[in-house]
Every structure is written in structure tokens, then in C-alpha cells.
């Protein structure tokens, strides 16, 4: 058992290093990992902001090791129960704030509805709310850059 723990830490450390190499939406990455049917990075590319800079061989090697470790049968229920599909992101909150400032509370209501069941698939909300940070939010204060005032 001790060697498994050491090996487990190694695979986790390698995952962390890989996730740092390319800008990744962690929520989408871990949610999509729950659904893969084979250890191929192509099934997870939606989670990356720059698909061209993905070190595919390194990713496929990691996925193969993980896949072998779970014997090709990841515990999907456990993974899905621990990786929400929908989380409140700064850009989503900003959309709700912008609309509310114009007396339109529909975005707040929609976000409230989505976030009541963050682990559910909710296909009706997928296109609008299951996505990486939009380009408009990349440099907008409050969406990607946060400040702290004292």
C-alpha cells in the first residue's frame, strides 16, 4: 500500500504540472474527465483556452497511466458527485450585475436557477453557462483581475 500512495502522489503531481502548462478551465476539465471513454486528450480539449499549445503526448501519457490505474473503469458517479458542471464565475456575476444595473434581473434569476443544481447536466443552460471565460472578460476588471481594498 505505501508504494501506491507514493505512486498516487506522483500521478497527481504530474497532473498539476500538466494543468499549469496550458491555460485550462479546471471546472470544465474535471467535469469532462468524468465522461471520457478512452484515454485521449482530444476528448478534453474543450477545457483548454489554446488548443494549439496542448502538449498532446504528455497528456496522452498521463491519461493512459490514469486509465490503467482505474482499470478503464473510472468511478464516474464519484467523479460527477464531486465535480460540479456549473459554478458561479466572475464573468457570469458581471453579466448579472450589468443587467441588474439596467433593472433587468432575468440574468440573476437564470443564474440562480442554474446554480441550484450545479451537478445536474441541465442541457438547456449548457450553451450559455457551461463555457470558458469569454474573451471580453479576459481583461475586464472584476472578471479576470480582482483587487482587494483595505
Where would I find each of the regions flagged by the language model?
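Regulatory N- and C-terminal appendages and interdomain linkers associated
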Residues: 7-150
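Single conserved hydrophobic/aromatic residue that forms the stacking wall/gate
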Residues: 1-6
Amino acid at each position: 500500500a505505501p508504494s501506491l500512495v507514493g505512486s498516487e502522489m506522483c500521478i497527481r503531481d504530474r497532473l498539476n504540472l500538466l494543468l499549469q502548462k496550458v491555460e485550462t478551465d479546471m471546472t470544465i476539465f474535471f467535469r469532462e474527465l468524468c465522461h471520457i471513454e478512452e484515454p485521449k486528450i482530444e476528448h478534453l480539449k474543450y477545457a483548454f483556452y489554446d488548443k494549439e499549445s496542448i502538449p498532446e503526448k504528455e497528456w496522452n501519457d498521463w491519461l493512459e497511466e490514469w486509465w490503467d490505474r482505474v482499470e478503464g473503469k473510472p468511478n464516474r458517479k464519484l467523479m460527477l458527485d464531486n465535480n460540479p458542471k456549473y459554478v458561479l464565475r466572475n464573468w457570469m456575476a458581471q453579466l448579472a450585475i450589468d443587467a441588474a444595473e439596467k433593472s433587468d434581473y432575468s440574468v440573476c434569476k437564470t443564474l440562480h436557477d442554474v446554480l441550484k443544481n450545479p451537478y445536474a447536466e441541465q442541457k438547456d443552460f449548457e450553451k450559455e453557462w457551461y463555457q470558458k471565460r469569454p474573451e471580453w472578460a479576459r481583461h475586464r476588471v472584476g472578471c479576470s483581475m480582482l483587487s482587494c481594498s483595505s
